[in-house]
Every structure is written in structure tokens, then in C-alpha cells.
Amino acid sequence: MAKEKFERSKPHVNVGTIGHVDHGKTTLTAALTTILAKKFGGAAKAYDQIDNAPEEKARGITINTSHVEYETETRHYAHVDCPGHADYVKNMITGAAQMDGAILVCSAADGPMPQTREHILLARQVGVPYIIVFMNKCDMVDDAELFQLVEMEIRDLLSSYDFPGDDCPIVQGSALKALEGDAAYEEKIFELATALDRYIPTPERAVDKPFLLPIEDVFSISGRGTVVTGRVERGIIHVGDEIEIVGLKETQKTTCTGVEMFRKLLDEGQAGDNVGVLLRGTKREDVERGQVLAKRGTITPHTKFKAEVYVLSKEEGGPHTPFFANYRPQFYFRTTDVTGTITLEKGVEMVMPGENVTITVELIAPIAMEEGLRFAIREGGRTVGAGVVSSVIA
């Protein structure tokens, strides 16, 4: 059977469910696919199809994640749901499934619970820009005051982590009742879909962002000059563009005099392309793997930053013992390792395998860095953790 062509007619948005265990994240995911498929087409997915999530690897870490898709009138959504709390933590920190917005599922019967709080904090740390709330299991509550109370609690909680708690849409419903075909609760799923369409702005496409290419290899071609190769992470590079080489050393300005792909000369390379870029007047020894090529003035080199990290458990091949302040592993950014020293938050004595924690890092060499940049923590060539830059300090 020929593969179906992916229809690109609607803008694409990445979302996911977050929230406390057993508050109904997977049931809601099933309800979204099932009920939206009836109206807009697409494949309905049952609870147990979503619940047995396949394993995948991201930055050397195994994560169980379910990916489903659904459509609304105006958009195509890719939606990620994780079976276990640890999978959420790993998923959000590694960026295995980048989210343009999250659906926070909170049971109306229980109100916010510890993981509700933890997932909101994680969303803040890893840069999930928008949260929409689905108050689930509303069929189990018949006290209007309780609804108001839970809603207020959720809004306060969101505000305490710098989300606009007063403005976040909150939809009250029951995913299970919707799946069972209760028309009033099916309507709530459409209401949630409309909230997604309205509240999460269409994300900027990778090609529309400023040009950035992590350098993987450097060659010198006699008579032509220096060529760097790598995959364009974002933006477009044209012949004649003024760019700079950032990271590890002093930032150098240069100009692109040629773009090659599969040994053919092109006028431009764009996000997702593996290209060779010819640099004017740049010496072979001035460039190395681990630096980036970028549009001038769009990214700067830094050595000190705060990050949210997940440390692998022993079972996952992580460390067998905790680490303490002044631990010095390697931090693998894009294409290279840089040694750095870890400082722990006040009151934190040590970090156990399998925990996630906020740290401050000082690198021995600068890296082209911005909030949201992902990295792996490695020791002796093996991954011991993963992290995301939550703020740049210096």
C-alpha cells in the first residue's frame, strides 16, 4: 500500500497532556481523537492503544510516549501523552516532544495534587508557552461551590508559576462520559478543541526563524576555502549572507559564498537540510565542531546558566551514587562536549539518580546559548542525565 501523503493544508501545532496521575490524561487523549475524528476525520484511538506507549530514545534516554494526531476546523494537532510521571519529566526536559502548548488535566473531584504542581513548574522551566486547563471528572461532582473552589486553586497555582492564571481557558467536562457518547460531554471536547485553536498561537515555522547551523565538520578545499557541514536547525542560509561563527572562541564574522547539498551547488539551504557552507576568508583552524553558524547578532556565547535536569536512574544506566555540588561532568550541546561545574540550589545537599532538579552550571568554554536549549550530561562518554537551559546568567 502506498503511503498516504501528509496533508499540509492546515497549520500544524504540537500539544500534550500534563497533570497528576489518574486525573484522566490518557482518557482525555482518547476522547480528543475519537470525538474530533467523528466531525473532522482522522483516526480514533482507544484508551488502551494510547496507554501502552512505545519506547523511544531522546538524548540517550529511554522514554515511553504515545503520539496521536487529530484535526479541528482550522488546524492539525500532534499530541503527546505519557504513561508515567517519570516519562513526563524526561519528555519535557529532553524536548523529545516539543510542546507549543499543554493541556493540564485536573480532576474536579480531587483538585490540584503534587504532580499537578510539578508539571506546571516543569512547563515553566522548559519553556512551554501556553497552558489550557481541562477540569475532568465533572460528572462526579455535584457541588457548584466545589467547582469554583477547584478552578480558583488551579488559577492561583498557574499564576504562582508565572502563567497568566486569570486568562487561561478552563473547560469543565468528563472525558470518560464523552467517550461513552454522552452528547453534553462530547460538546465539552469540542469546546476544548476551540480553546486550543484560539488560545495557542500558530507557532513560527523553523524556516521563518533566524538562521542557525550547528557545525559538525570542517574541511578546507584548495582554491575555494573553508567548508563547514551540518544540518540547518532553523532559518535559511543564502549565498552572500553575512553570518558569524559563535561559541568556544571569540565570535568571528564571515560571509557565505556557497551552499552545497549532495554535491550540488544551491542558492540556499533551509531548516532540515544537511548542507556544506563555504565561508569567505575563514581559516580551517579558526573553526571547529561544536560552534554554530548563525545570522549575525541573533545568538551569543555564554558560560553560566541555570538549568532543569533529569538524572538517569541506576536501572536506566545512570550513576549508581548521588552527586554533590562541584560535580564536574561534560555537557553535550548540539555537537560537542564541554566540561562544566555544577552548583546546587540552596538547601539541596545532593542529587540522587532518577531525580529532576534545578542546577547552575559554569562551563570552561562558551557555547552559543539561549533559553530552551537542550543538552545531555555525560561522564566518560556515557549519558548520565539530560537538561534544558532555563535561564542564561553570563
Swiss-Prot record:
Domain tr-type G: from-to ranges: 10-204
InterPro entries the record matches: EF-Tu_GTP-bd, EF-Tu_GTPase, EFTu-like_2, EFTU_2, G_TR_CS, P-loop_NTPase, Small_GTP-bd, T_Tr_GTP-bd_dom
Start and end residues of each stretch annotated as G2: 60-64
Principal location class: cytoplasm
Molecular function terms from GO: GTP binding; GTPase activity; guanosine tetraphosphate binding; translation elongation factor activity
Gene Ontology annotations for the cellular component aspect, listed alphabetically: cytosol
Chain intervals for the UniProt region annotation (G1): 19-26
Residues annotated as binding GTP: 19-26, 81-85, 136-139
Cited Pfam families: GTP_EFTU, GTP_EFTU_D2, GTP_EFTU_D3
Subcellular location: Cytoplasm
Region (G3): 81-84
UniProt KW Metal-binding keyword: yes
Annotated segments matching region G5: 174-176
Coiled-coil residue windows: none
G4: annotated segments: 136-139
Similarity-based family: Belongs to the TRAFAC class translation factor GTPase superfamily. Classic translation factor GTPase family. EF-Tu/EF-1A subfamily.
Function: GTP hydrolase that promotes the GTP-dependent binding of aminoacyl-tRNA to the A-site of ribosomes during protein biosynthesis.
Name under which the protein is recorded: Elongation factor Tu
Organism: Neisseria gonorrhoeae
Originating gene: tuf
